[in-house]
């Protein structure tokens, strides 16, 4: 297992065996940009989280299966409670939406080695959900202020 503390995020990863014929890799990362951006007075506060995994199983020397996945969550809030509400920050807040995005991909590949030939069967599924929300003057108290 290995951990990483970066300038804008923290993460952990691990890999190894899950038995005699199976191996794994996994990692997770999360940003703390929202705290840094708040400290330096920026009007938006982004946060991201992502994770990935891979599992590989060898049935025998001629057949193997690999399953993998990745996913991410992006979340950007507006820093409307700033002490320094400069004209520049007011302008940025006037047009920036709140952003919420989720995405993932899952996949698998089955490989069969036959002499000099390789046969593969591959399946995958991906999805992205993207939601941007903007209220006039960032006032969420009235539904009619919703503009995006």
Where do the PLM segments sit?
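Residues on the lipid-exposed face of transmembrane beta-strands in outer-membrane beta-barrel proteins
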Residues: 12-16, 53-57, 108-112, 148
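Short alpha-helical segments and helix-capping/turn motifs at coil-helix boundaries
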Residues: 8-10, 50-51, 103-106
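Flexible loop and strand-edge segments within Gram-negative outer membrane beta-barrel domains
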Residues: 64-113, 119, 125-147
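Structural motif
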Residues: 9-11, 32, 118
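A generic beta-sheet turn/junction motif
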Residues: 5-9, 18-19, 112-116
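Structured loops at beta-to-helix junctions and adjacent beta-edge loops in soluble globular domains
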Residues: 5-6, 29, 70, 122-124
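Solvent-exposed loop/turn segments connecting transmembrane beta-strands
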Residues: 1-11, 45
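Periplasmic-side early beta-strands and strand-to-turn transitions of outer-membrane beta-barrels
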Residues: 17-99
């Amino acid at each position: 297992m290995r951990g990483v503390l970066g300038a804008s995020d923290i993460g952990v990863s691990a890999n190894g065996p899950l038995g005699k014929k199976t191996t794994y890799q996994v990692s997770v990362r999360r940003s703390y940009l929202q705290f840094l951006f708040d400290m330096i007075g920026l009007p938006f506060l982004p946060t991201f989280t992502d994770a990935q995994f891979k599992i590989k199983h060898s049935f025998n020397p001629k057949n193997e299966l690999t399953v993998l996945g990745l996913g991410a969550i992006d979340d950007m809030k507006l820093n409307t409670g700033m002490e320094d509400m400069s004209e520049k920050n007011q302008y940025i807040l006037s047009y920036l939406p709140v952003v919420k995005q989720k995405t993932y991909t899952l996949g698998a590949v089955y490989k069969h080695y036959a002499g000099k030939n390789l046969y593969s069967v591959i399946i995958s599924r991906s999805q992205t959900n993207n939601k941007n929300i903007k209220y006039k003057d960032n006032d969420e108290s009235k539904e009619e202020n919703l503009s995006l």
